[in-house]
Amino acid sequence: MPSWKELVLVKGHPMQRIYIEKVVVNIGVGASGEKLEKAAGLLKELTGAEPSRRRAKKSIKDFGIRKGEPIGVAVTLRRDQAVNFLMRALQAVNNRVKKTSFDDRGNVCFGIKEHILLPGVKYDPAVGIWGMDVCVKLAKPGLRVQLRRRRRSKVGKRQLVTKEEAIEFFQKVLGVQVD
């Protein structure tokens, strides 16, 4: 697997290079309890990182969900962990991503219908089959100026990743077919 430093799309100036900032993997369980624990264990096994519990924003009586109840698990991966998981996730979707999966800020989200589609994962009847969402955030150097707490400042539009740049990154650097 390539290092996260090697997966960069260089476009002239060094401050215009595009890289993978983070990958967020989410499993929406829809209920707490044993199902949530199974999903958390699976996510930890797949990514090697400790998942965080995601709570319901509001109560939905028809689904039996109360506000504040944990109903999902997610994990944020950065650097080499993010690249390794992203490569496996792209293999699970046959290196194809829809053009509508890209937003205007350089974020890409796609779903995996069953976790057993990931390479090297076998079916375990005790865990079951889970689908997951994979979200990739692309960035350019200097974006931290806008996100940090102290001495926060605005960043020019050239420092934001556009939809076209994100598509170009996925096609040229990752070898993904965008439909």
Swiss-Prot record:
InterPro entries: Ribosomal_uL5 (IPR002132), Ribosomal_uL5_arc (IPR022804), Ribosomal_uL5_C (IPR031309), Ribosomal_uL5_dom_sf (IPR022803), Ribosomal_uL5_N (IPR031310). HAMAP family: Ribosomal_uL5_A. This is one of the proteins that bind and probably mediate the attachment of the 5S RNA into the large ribosomal subunit, where it forms part of the central protuberance. In the 70S ribosome it contacts protein S13 of the 30S subunit (bridge B1b), connecting the 2 subunits; this bridge is implicated in subunit movement. May contact the P site tRNA; the 5S rRNA and some of its associated proteins might help stabilize positioning of ribosome-bound tRNAs. One of its GO terms (biological process) is translation. One of its GO terms (cellular component) is cytosolic large ribosomal subunit. Pfam families: Ribosomal_L5 (PF00281), Ribosomal_L5_C (PF00673). This is Large ribosomal subunit protein uL5. GO terms for molecular function: RNA binding; rRNA binding; structural constituent of ribosome; tRNA binding. Part of the 50S ribosomal subunit; contacts the 5S rRNA and probably tRNA. Forms a bridge to the 30S subunit in the 70S ribosome. It comes from Pyrobaculum aerophilum (strain ATCC 51768 / DSM 7523 / JCM 9630 / CIP 104966 / NBRC 100827 / IM2). Belongs to the universal ribosomal protein uL5 family. Gene3D superfamilies: 3.30.1440.10. Keywords: Ribonucleoprotein, Ribosomal protein, RNA-binding, rRNA-binding, tRNA-binding.
